[in-house]
Regions:
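Conserved structural motif at the start of ABC-family nucleotide-binding domains
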Residues: 6, 21-23
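Conserved A-loop
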Residues: 12-18, 64
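Catalytic Walker B motif of ABC-type/P-loop ATPase nucleotide-binding domains
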Residues: 156-160
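Conserved ABC transporter NBD signature motif
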Residues: 52-53, 60-71
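ABC-family P-loop ATPase nucleotide-binding domains
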Residues: 74-77, 83-143
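The feature captures the beta-strand-to-loop junction immediately N-terminal to the Walker
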Residues: 34-39
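A short, proline-enriched helix->beta-strand linker immediately N-terminal to the Walker B motif
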Residues: 149-154
């Protein structure tokens, strides 16, 4: 049975001549906590992006509930990939106010808990009318953690949550 299991088999990824993932096998089960440790440039963020259908792979297979993650609505609803916001980007999401960024995140997660998001916003003392680009690095981390928690996704992946 593959219920709620995110699985990679034979995963390979290269950038030009640099192979960052070689024949990687990985199984992630809901309700468990995993850690991924490696040096800068080792392929951690690349792997997380591939597992969540946000980056392409060269070869191998990634499945959720036994089905490929690409173009899989169940995987999109059930897996939250919350990645580090970049303070240097002043376009895209960083140009949004916190309240609009959270509203857009709610669209992607069918289990989104708006009340919980509001409570976390207050508890983290985040100003909802501030643009993402105006937040400190620590506040940006709080926004990514808030989204991960409020998504209520069975599988939540945090990339550098406290960077």
């Amino acid at each position: 049975m593959n219920a709620g299991i995110l699985k990679a088999q034979g995963l390979c990824k290269s950038y030009k001549d640099k192979e960052v993932l070689h024949n990687l096998d990985l199984t992630i089960e809901p309700g468990k906590i995993y850690g991924l440790i490696g040096r800068n440039g080792a392929g951690k963020t690349t792997l997380l992006g591939i597992l969540t259908a946000q980056n392409t792979k060269n070869s191998g297979e990634v499945t959720y509930d036994g089905q490929p993650v690409w173009e899989n609505q169940k995987a999109l609803n059930d897996i939250c990939f919350s990645r580090e916001l970049q303070a240097t980007l002043f376009s895209g999401p960083n140009n949004l106010k916190v309240k609009h960024y959270l509203k857009s995140a709610a669209i992607y997660y069918s289990r989104w808990d708006q009340d919980y998001a509001g409570r976390l916003l207050e508890e983290f003392k985040l100003e909802k009318k501030k643009k993402i680009s105006q937040l400190s690095k620590g506040q940006m981390s709080m926004v990514t953690i808030l989204i991960a928690l409020a998504s209520k996704a069975p599988i939540t992946i945090l990339d550098e949550p406290a960077a």
